[in-house]
Swiss-Prot record:
Keywords: Cytoplasm, Protein biosynthesis. The keyword Lipoprotein does not apply. GO terms for molecular function: ribosomal large subunit binding. It comes from Cyanothece sp. (strain PCC 7425 / ATCC 29141). GO terms for cellular component: cytoplasm. It is found in: Cytoplasm. Responsible for the release of ribosomes from messenger RNA at the termination of protein biosynthesis. May increase the efficiency of translation by recycling ribosomes from one round of translation to another. Belongs to the RRF family. InterPro entries: Ribosome_recyc_fac (IPR002661), Ribosome_recyc_fac_dom (IPR023584), RRF_sf (IPR036191). The keyword Protein biosynthesis applies. NCBIfam families: frr. This is Ribosome-recycling factor. It holds the Pfam family RRF. One of its GO terms (biological process) is translational termination.
């Protein structure tokens, strides 16, 4: 396994963690809150973004304008069934979601959720490290690499691991600050 591949896999873990953080509600309207919402549309689970134009007319409202008016009730149902805790307001052409300000208890809950997502990201990075180190050790046993090369590569892999775990920690600190800001 090449170091560039290891770094690429670790970067993808950080990006996945960032995407997961984007789905956490922070009290401000953000269209990425709806990224995980899928709608049962003509028998298939379809991402909401494929069925509607999503916008934020102001800092506390998300507007969803379906391309097909027949999907309005389906979209409303999907949002109600999601884990977002938001109540859709359907006026016949547009669905509006009012984002209420967060309570202190809800903020604490969201910080815990963010911490859990960050830990999952770190575990993913550590799994990449484990696989890379195992690969290097196998190459060492097979005689493809000297002991010094094995040790050097292991050190480089550990440095990459530390770098990307620090990135996840930075994202977590940023998200916690975002959640805690009233």
């Amino acid at each position: 396994m090449k170091l560039a591949d290891v770094e690429d896999h670790m970067q993808k873990s950080v990006e996945a963690t960032q995407r997961a953080f984007n789905t956490i509600r922070t009290g401000r309207a953000n269209t990425s809150l709806l990224d995980r919402v899928t709608v049962e549309y003509y028998g298939a689970e379809t991402p909401l973004r494929s069925l509607a134009n999503i916008s934020t007319p102001d800092s506390s409202t998300i507007a969803i304008q379906p391309f097909d008016r027949n999907s309005l009730n389906l979209i409303e149902k999907a949002i109600s069934m999601s884990d977002l805790g938001l109540t859709p307001n359907n006026d016949g052409t547009v669905i509006r979601l009012n984002i209420p300000p967060l309570t202190s208890d809800r903020r604490k809950e969201l910080v815990k959720t963010a911490s859990k997502l960050a830990e999952e990201g770190k575990v993913s990075i550590r799994n990449v490290r484990r696989d890379a180190v195992d690969s290097v050790k196998k190459q060492g046993k097979a005689g493809e690499l000297s002991e010094d090369e094995v040790k050097d590569l292991q050190d480089k892999i550990q440095k990459l691991t530390d770098k990307y775990i620090a990135k996840v920690d930075g994202l977590l600190a940023e998200k916690e600050k975002d959640i805690s800001t009233v």
